[in-house]
Amino acid sequence: MFFVYRSNQIDILFTKICKIIKKKPLLNIFEREIIIHDNEILFQNLNTFIANHTGIAADFKLIYPNVFIWKLFKQVFSDIQLNNIFSRSTITWKIMKIIEENDFCKFVQKKDKIMKKFEFSFLMSHLYQQYILYRPNWINMWEKNKKNTLKIEKKDEWQAKLWIKIILYTEKLQQSKWHFSNLFKKFKTLKKIEHIKFPKRIFIIYSISLNPKYMEIFKKISTYTDIYFLSINACEKKIFHISFAKNYVVQKNNLLMNLSEKYEKFYFLFFKKFKKIKYNNFFQKNNSNNLLNIVKNDFLNFKEKENLLKKNSFLLKDNSISINICCDKKHEIEVLYNKLLSFFNEDSKLKPSDIVITSFSLNTYIIYINSIFKSKNKKEKIPFYISKKHSDKIEKILFIFNKILNLPNIRCNNEEILDLIEIQDIRDKFDISEEEINILYEWIEKANIRWGLHENEKQKNNLIFIKKNQNTWFYGIKKLLISHAINEEEEVWNNVLSCTSINTSRTELIGKLINFIKVLDQWRDKLFFSKKIKSWRPLFLCFIKDFFYKNEKIRDSIDIINKTWTKMIDDATLSNYEKKIPISILKKKFSHIMNNFSEKKFLPGVINFCHPSLVCYIPFKIKCIIGAEYQEIPKKKLSSFNLIDKYPLTSDLHICKENYIFLQNFISTQETLYISYVGHSLKNNNKVRSSILIDQLLNHITSNFYVSEHHDYKNNKKEIFEHICKKHKKENLYEKKQVNKINLNTLQKTKKINQEIYNKIFSIKNRIISTSTQISLKSLISFWKNPIRYFFNYTLNIKLKIAKRNIITEPFSINLFDDFKISNIIFKKILNNESIKDEFKKIILSGILPYGHFGSILLKEKKKEIENIVKAIYKYRISSPKKENFDIKIEKYNINGCLDEIQNTGLLRWKLGTINYRDRISLWLEHLIYCILGGTGESKIIGYKKNFFSFYPLSSHLAYNYLFTYIEGYMKGMKNPLLLIKSGSNWFDKVYDKKNDCIKKNDDIKRKAYKILYHTWMGNEYITGEKEDLYIQQIISELNVKKICKISQKWFTPILKHQKK
């Protein structure tokens, strides 16, 4: 017998299961109750429910619908060998084989690249799998070569021809041609099912993946066993029944109709055509105590209120449904976290297990969930679990496996290889410690290893480079070995330059590095060339052997992945595809298989994050749906080839899957439904629409509720919208524009390092600051070059050292440090009229320079630039330079130090780079001392590309007053940080009017000056902004432009005022 139990609550249906089991217990105590469903979480919930509510220890067995049907076919047709030859993987490779030999379709040709052929085959295999399940009549007709009887357009008939070729090819391989479509047809023709022992009863809980054809099979076997079909319905009425339809005109925007039309329509028509079906309705009205339950009751009774007298009053205190519009995904999780805290604060009885958070695009939120839910303080920590596709162990292995499979596609630059070494499992395999990682970074930088394992790699990658070892891993290792052997700095041996300052006690680390690079080289060779499918079969186990210690902790995970890999290869082998294939195709195929794999775990006692389908029937007090944008619910489907979408049927329930899941989550929410989505595009800040389902829900509420009888529809709608839809703004919007791009991870690390010390020191009102009146010129200059860093280093004794592992990966440019080093070497030689031939050879062999002629040109240009600087120095270095020690008294302070390079014309300074504000302030302070000591010349500094800066001579009295002012500024800056920064200096350079000694009045110039300040602060992809400075980050929580400009004006005015034009 076939029983249909309908209800709007899953718990009621669970209770009915309990009563049936109690009333008609199974005679065989070893027999298990059969539950057919595809959701393990619901099955766990059923077991928990029965244990909590009845005390029955029933032995349930969960069987997936497709597994049950295939097993049934095997029993019914025991004389047929059923091997599921028509799996998606096997069909893919059979299509590949066919299109290698035939040009029968305009979309793909024999001459096309193998990846294009694979993608086409992969797509078509997916469509044929759907046709087999949802259009068995098409498949059966195609196999009889009756294409025209199906009323499919002529332009689509190529799909039928391709399927016929697949069947013919299967027969040619002497494989079974049985699949669901022809088995279903054969099963339907059976008058009697014999020699099968059916269970006493079967419980079927409806799910959207329950194929309508499966339902026909279940109906057929209900003659031999009791089938209990448990259906969760939002609506009690049979909305497609003739008697009901006459009295109700369906509105186009009716929310329930849009959500459940196909489902309701199909099952009404399906059950109507069968006899011997017993219906049992167990619907229960929701307590009408809030907006959520009133809407659910509207669904239950299928009501739409047309006039004000029938509408419900909307209470502005009601928050049972809320729609939250956020700025970005991270902000969405921050808002959610704060909302969860308020839920717990408002209800002391609320438990984490009473709340569930769902998303159709959960993977895009995982990084933010972990960072926000784990980073909050312990008092506010919320226990949570993310239901991911794979366990952490499987994810870790897959991550490394994909990295290794991608070796043929990378250039093996230093960052890519070091990223691999830093993975814990790889480090353990090659016995490399954390400390040794830091040493490797240093060695790689000194050996100038950039990219390529060896010179042949560059040819392999088809890059336009000369065959040269320079900057490769093996050449860099050779340099390290020579450095250890000769133990001297920068010596040339056999035309290889040794590295400087290499720790010779770390010989074993070079051995580990050589071993690792050799293994990578072997894998690049292994993966670089295409192979026959069978040859790829042992690949995964080889990977585990080379990169992992196979321990008990990961054994199960390795077995799961290996079984999946080998099954994929074995399925492909069944197709008899003989051509060689690249690893990129198998990588893509394997990624798809693993992405469809799901563990479906649910942790008790915490807030679970999961896909909405896992909990759509399970009641929770609070349900949260995040990521409810229009492109996510429902997801847009590309159906250019899909004939199911082109020729739809009422039975195509899977097409509206997201709608149905949303509806079920809605009706299973008990107290509060929280919905959120990102309301603005990150690309262009345009408004992003919410899901159409959210819009329809809002339309239903505004059409059926009112705030005040005195308001018209428009005003009522506006008030309801404003209450339900909450637009969340990011705090400190000004800060967001100016400061928010700070690297938050780095900042958090910094704060973690020194927050306690920082708070402790700043909490002491009377800090002990050195009040010594003895000040060295060196300290004074060091302070004014960077007052904030000096304050931290010398007043607070805090030095922020966050490791920056930014190493050069490209051989096209020189980093700033190497550029300075080269310039300094050449400068000293030219200044002292010494030969630079040997130094040039060392520089070329070091690998610092770009390849070939590029490096030679760069070196010549560098030499030319430095020669120009030296010429300028000789122009002003008329006499032999003098040096003078001094100790002068400025009010109560004694300033001591030494001035060098004193010419008759004044102080002479030079720099091999561009002159910046720190160079100018340094020269200014020295110039003040020079003038106080009686100097009457101009102090000047010569820089790169004829850059020149000088000061007019000052009277001793004026210089004395200025120096006293800067000393007082120094003493104050030692107590409280002085906000004198480059952003302010650049602003002041633009806006200062030297002629009138004031700020320029022109508004256009002012705007440009503020723009310069902003760009200096923010930086760009080439230049790091000042906002990234860790010391500044500790002082400034938001950009205070007014304060920065005021301080800059005070301290830079004397410098620009006395600057020589």
From Swiss-Prot:
Gene Ontology biological-process annotations: double-strand break repair via homologous recombination
GO MF annotation: an example: DNA binding
Protein name: RecBCD enzyme subunit RecC
Subunit structure: Heterotrimer of RecB, RecC and RecD. All subunits contribute to DNA-binding.
Organism: Buchnera aphidicola subsp. Schizaphis graminum (strain Sg)
SUPFAM superfamilies, sorted: P-loop containing nucleoside triphosphate hydrolases, Restriction endonuclease-like
Purpose: A helicase/nuclease that prepares dsDNA breaks (DSB) for recombinational DNA repair. Binds to DSBs and unwinds DNA via a highly rapid and processive ATP-dependent bidirectional helicase activity. Unwinds dsDNA until it encounters a Chi (crossover hotspot instigator) sequence from the 3' direction. Cuts ssDNA a few nucleotides 3' to the Chi site. The properties and activities of the enzyme are changed at Chi. The Chi-altered holoenzyme produces a long 3'-ssDNA overhang and facilitates RecA-binding to the ssDNA for homologous DNA recombination and repair.
Miscellaneous: In the RecBCD complex, RecB has a slow 3'-5' helicase, an exonuclease activity and loads RecA onto ssDNA, RecD has a fast 5'-3' helicase activity, while RecC stimulates the ATPase and processivity of the RecB helicase and contributes to recognition of the Chi site.
Listed GO CC annotations: exodeoxyribonuclease V complex
Keywords for the protein's UniProt record, in alphabetical order: ATP-binding, DNA damage, DNA repair, DNA-binding, Exonuclease, Helicase, Hydrolase, Nuclease, Nucleotide-binding
InterPro entries recorded: DExx_box_DNA_helicase_dom_sf (IPR013986), P-loop_NTPase (IPR027417), RecC (IPR006697), RecC_C (IPR041500), Restrct_endonuc-II-like (IPR011335)
Gene3D superfamilies attached to this UniProt entry: 1.10.10.160, 1.10.10.990, 3.40.50.10930, P-loop containing nucleotide triphosphate hydrolases (3.40.50.300)
